[in-house]
């Protein structure tokens, strides 16, 4: 039995609220259970130096947690003067995942920055950030299309992410903090709605696992991402 009482293949409740802020071209508050992340997409009419003059765009991401997003207060990384390795790893993952579904040539020479701020953490903050990031990106691109700034839709597919793990010997979907802390294997999958895999991260802690267990985790991830894709479509009216 999972601590939450959920079935092995049961997601936490998903909520996606769009238009959560007034200034960003795209914004959402996404919740996976008690994990809540504010995600904004900001359009900038510039690109990184390595892309200047090449006629194509870029999508990048930044990630951070509010000091009391967790059980005990954590210091702001800005106050420390540098980002942690974990933060850098997660924001690179978010950026890679979203770039996997964008045709940069159709975006034109502009950049979209996805900012992910964790308001409350109960496991799965990176997967919620990616899943909400796609919605914010979709909203921002829709504004570019509506204004005539771009002629063609650069988004090629939906992308979503979910965590899975082996808890007390059972593969389970969408780990919360308690499960994640006690799982002897955990994985994060980033999937496209066409079935392709953008990223797969799976690690063992204390005990290894076999190939069949990995495939069972992937099958669970497909179930979870299917639910997220449906929530994304509902949020964006597509």
Curated annotation (Swiss-Prot):
Signal peptide: none annotated. It comes from the Bacteria. InterPro entries: ExoRNase_PH_dom1 (IPR001247), ExoRNase_PH_dom2 (IPR015847), ExoRNase_PH_dom2_sf (IPR036345), PNPase/RNase_PH_dom_sf (IPR027408), Ribosomal_Su5_D2-typ_SF (IPR020568), RNase_PH (IPR050080), RNase_PH_bac-type (IPR002381), RNase_PH_CS (IPR018336). Phosphorolytic 3'-5' exoribonuclease that plays an important role in tRNA 3'-end maturation. Removes nucleotide residues following the 3'-CCA terminus of tRNAs; can also add nucleotides to the ends of RNA molecules by using nucleoside diphosphates as substrates, but this may not be physiologically important. Probably plays a role in initiation of 16S rRNA degradation (leading to ribosome degradation) during starvation. It holds the Pfam family RNase_PH_C. It catalyses: tRNA(n+1) + phosphate = tRNA(n) + a ribonucleoside 5'-diphosphate. Its EC number is 2.7.7.56. GO terms for biological process: rRNA catabolic process; rRNA processing; tRNA processing. NCBIfam families: RNasePH. Phosphate binds at residues 86, 124-126. SUPFAM superfamilies: Ribonuclease PH domain 2-like, Ribosomal protein S5 domain 2-like. GO terms for molecular function: 3'-5'-RNA exonuclease activity; tRNA binding; tRNA nucleotidyltransferase activity. Keywords: Nucleotidyltransferase, RNA-binding, rRNA processing, Transferase, tRNA processing, tRNA-binding. PANTHER family: EXOSOME COMPLEX COMPONENT, EXOSOME COMPLEX COMPONENT RRP41. Homohexameric ring arranged as a trimer of dimers. It is an enzyme of class 2 (transferase). Belongs to the RNase PH family. This is Ribonuclease PH.
């Amino acid at each position: 039995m999972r601590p939450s009482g959920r079935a092995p293949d049961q997601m936490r409740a998903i909520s996606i609220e769009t238009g959560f802020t007034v200034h960003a071209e795209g914004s959402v508050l996404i919740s996976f259970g008690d994990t809540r992340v504010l995600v904004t997409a900001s359009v900038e009419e510039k690109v990184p130096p390595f892309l200047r003059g090449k006629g194509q765009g870029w999508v990048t991401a930044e990630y951070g947690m509010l000091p009391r997003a967790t059980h005990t207060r954590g210091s702001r990384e800005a106050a420390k003067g540098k980002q942690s390795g974990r933060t850098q790893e997660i924001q690179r993952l978010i950026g890679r995942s979203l770039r996997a579904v964008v045709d940069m040539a159709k975006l034109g020479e502009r950049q979209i920055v996805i900012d992910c701020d964790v308001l409350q953490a109960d496991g799965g903050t990176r997967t919620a950030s990616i899943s909400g990031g796609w919605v914010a990106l979709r909203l921002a691109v829709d504004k570019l299309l509506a204004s005539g700034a771009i002629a063609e839709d650069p988004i090629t597919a939906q992308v979503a992410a979910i965590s899975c793990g082996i808890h007390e010997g059972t593969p389970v979907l969408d780990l919360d903090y308690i499960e994640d802390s006690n799982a002897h294997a955990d994985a994060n999958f980033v999937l496209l709605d066409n079935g392709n895999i953008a990223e797969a991260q799976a690690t063992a802690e204390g005990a290894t696992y076999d190939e069949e267990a990995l495939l069972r985790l992937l099958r669970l991830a497909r179930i979870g991402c299917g639910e997220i894709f449906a929530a994304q479509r509902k949020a964006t009216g597509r």
